[in-house]
Amino acid sequence: MKIYYIGVLRNSDDKTLELSSVKDLSQFGFFERNSVAQFMSFFSETVAGRTSAGQRQSVEEGNYVGHVYARPEGICGVLITDKEYPVRPAYTLLNKVLDEYLVAHPPIQWKDVTESDDSLKLKELDIYIAKYQDPSQADAIMRVQQELDETKITLHKTIENVLQRGEKLDNLVDKSESLSAASRMFYKQAKKTNSCCIVM
């Protein structure tokens, strides 16, 4: 999973303008990087210009996906990723970026500009392109699911470790003095019920 580009573009006029962007070109060869960077900007301007206010869309191009979110204020966020990057974290990140951009740069600052200006950059984009390479950083639900999976793995390992010492759960149940005869019988019946069925 990889993020290659995060951009904020003005799409309220006829000419779409890239206001702030960051690119991760580390996976491309040195001589390819300039062309790839130009193509990412061109792709972003094209899809941003064709995305209506309030609309979200994901556009596939080769091995890449451009996730686009246009806001009613006249700006649009574009995230270019590989195909494996999940959609929900992509839009969560775009929403965060656009919210922060509008706080840092209200529309009055960029509505009438005709070319990119360094004063309109969002410095946090450099941090975000590194941090959100892991999509669980952008998506709380995904992060909780990952933590639950890790807990489940730990629980399975703990049970396996007890059984690896040469003790079987059946033997422990039989030897246990704290279990009543009824509890032992319940355990054995439950084990029989959960075992594979025999076809006669």
UniProtKB/Swiss-Prot annotation:
Chain residues carrying a lipid of type S-palmitoyl cysteine: 196
The v-SNARE coiled-coil homology domain, residue ranges: 140-200
Localisation per UniProt entry: Cell membrane
Boundaries of every Longin domain copy: 7-129
Topology versus the membrane: Lipid-anchor
Pfam family for this entry, one: Longin
Lipid attachment, kind S-farnesyl cysteine: 197
Keywords for the protein's UniProt record, in alphabetical order: Cell membrane, Coiled coil, Lipoprotein, Membrane, Methylation, Palmitate, Prenylation
GO cellular component, one term: Golgi apparatus
Gene Ontology BP annotations: endoplasmic reticulum to Golgi vesicle-mediated transport
Residues cleaved off as propeptide: 198-200
Record-linked InterPro entries: Longin-like_dom_sf, Longin_dom, R-SNARE_YKT6, Synaptobrevin-like, V_SNARE_CC
Disulphide bridges, residue numbers: none
Molecular function as annotated in GO: SNAP receptor activity
Residue list for modification Cysteine methyl ester: 197
Family that this chain belongs to: Belongs to the synaptobrevin family.
Protein name according to UniProt: Synaptobrevin homolog YKT6
Organism: Kluyveromyces lactis (strain ATCC 8585 / CBS 2359 / DSM 70799 / NBRC 1267 / NRRL Y-1140 / WM37) (Yeast)
